[in-house]
Amino acid sequence: MIDDILKDTLAPALKRLAFKRRGLCWNRRRGAFVDVISIQKARFSTQEEEHIKGYVAVCVPEFREIIFGPSPPFFTEADGIFSFRFTELEMNDLSGRVLDTWWKIRKENSKSIACDLQRLIAHKAVPFFDSCSSFIEAERLVCCKEGGLSTPPIFN
């Protein structure tokens, strides 16, 4: 079910937005940033019901290279300077206090879930990436995730 949603709905939509796919993860290079959209399948999924959740992340290859060495050819949400769950984007709450939500996909609701995911990416994830177009904006989002500024801004 999720494989069909990814193949038939998400992959074509993300390809049109210049994302490249590897497994359940998509990357798009945008200036100094790499945008990441990642889907995770739950281990407890069955053939009748699959459970998924999603993440968005923004990676900065130059930062990663300074700290860890060469950047990977493909980034995951764990490589990001920050990542947010789809649930956080959906609820417009990037504080880190939103509880995680797993989508339960069954044969009878797979088309509805596909539409929900496509809408979330188009109306939440892409505008989120667009809002993070400078290091100042990226720092604001990191501070949002950490609960506010504890030190003066680095980029100003």
PLM segments and residue spans:
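Intrinsically disordered, low-complexity regulatory regions enriched in serine/threonine/proline
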Residues: 1-9, 21, 28-156
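Pyridoxal 5′-phosphate
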Residues: 14
